[in-house]
Regions:
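Charged/polar low-complexity intrinsically disordered segments
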Residues: 13-14
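An exposed, glycine/acidic-rich loop-and-rim segment of catalytic or binding clefts
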Residues: 29-269
């Protein structure tokens, strides 16, 4: 399947497999050394840093079922998702980081972060809105990717944790930031559900000027659990109820065609 994607412009996947293997080796410590405060073994002091007069920190979410999620307000990055298997043994099902320095200096800068203002690629970093052309920051070959080089994944968000299962992040993106028009106020919530063990992500955004926005999370999952040695994702089963897909060109921009998935590596039905 991976051969169907051009590799030169997949900025967030460049050298990913080498990066993931090295990261998994460090995650053994995180996965198997729980502390009194959290199952992942993460140390709050390792995530406390002053960046441009704003403080980063570690936040632990817990629900009534014992599920636990660790996040930081730098890029709203998810650091671990600890879930029990059928025998009650906990495992982390996302790749993550064990310090704020690792988050900031990661060779995969989008790992588990909130993406904005606009997820995915914008061709040549340009778009026209109501007759006005806007030029965005270029960071992926000829294109703008995931909001630009200093998108939401690099920002320190304001944070409040109103209850153990919920954390709310806020960030105001100034008019013209990375080339996008309008002051954009964003609220992003992580919430653990008690009955379903679901991690719910909610986004809200308001603006004072016509603009575009496309928020998402760039999670890297391995539902077999992250450990050392780690199982691969090859035994994970993926189902996508789609009969068609959109092909991309040599710089990963949609060609405008809509093709059938039948008989292609894109068929996950």
């Amino acid at each position: 399947m991976f051969s169907t994607f051009p590799s030169n412009y997949l900025g967030e996947q460049k050298n990913f497999f080498l990066f993931a293997r090295n990261l998994i080796n460090t995650m053994d410590m995180i996965n198997t050394t729980p502390t009194e405060s959290n199952l992942s073994g993460l140390n709050q002091k390792d995530f406390q840093k002053d960046i441009n007069n704003k403080k980063t920190d570690l936040f632990i979410l817990k629900n009534a079922q014992g599920m636990e999620v660790a996040v930081t307000n730098y890029g709203c990055a998810i650091l671990s998702i600890m879930v029990p298997d059928k025998n009650g043994k906990y495992a982390n099902v996302v790749l993550g980081h064990d310090s704020i320095e690792h988050v900031i200096n990661s060779p995969e800068p989008f790992l588990n972060t909130t993406i904005g203002r606009y997820g995915n690629r914008i061709a040549k970093g340009k778009f026209t809105l109501y007759g006005e052309e806007h030029q965005l920051a270029i960071n992926n070959g000829p294109n703008s990717l995931h909001g630009g080089p200093t998108g939401f994944h690099t920002r320190v968000w304001d944070a409040v944790q109103p209850e153990p299962s919920t954390v709310i992040f806020n960030y105001t993106s100034a008019d013209g930031e990375e080339g996008f028009p309008g002051n954009l106020e964003v609220e992003m919530t992580y919430r653990l559900e008690d009955e379903t063990n679901a991690l719910v992500i909610e986004y809200r955004a308001t603006t004072d000027k016509a603009t575009i926005v496309n928020l998402t999370n760039h999670g890297f999952f391995n539902l077999a659990g992250i450990a050392n040695p780690s199982p691969t994702v090859l035994n994970n089963i993926v189902t996508i109820n789609a009969d068609f897909y959109v092909p991309i060109d040599e710089v990963s921009i949609p060609t405008g065609e809509i093709l059938k998935v039948e008989g292609t590596p894109m068929d996950f039905r």
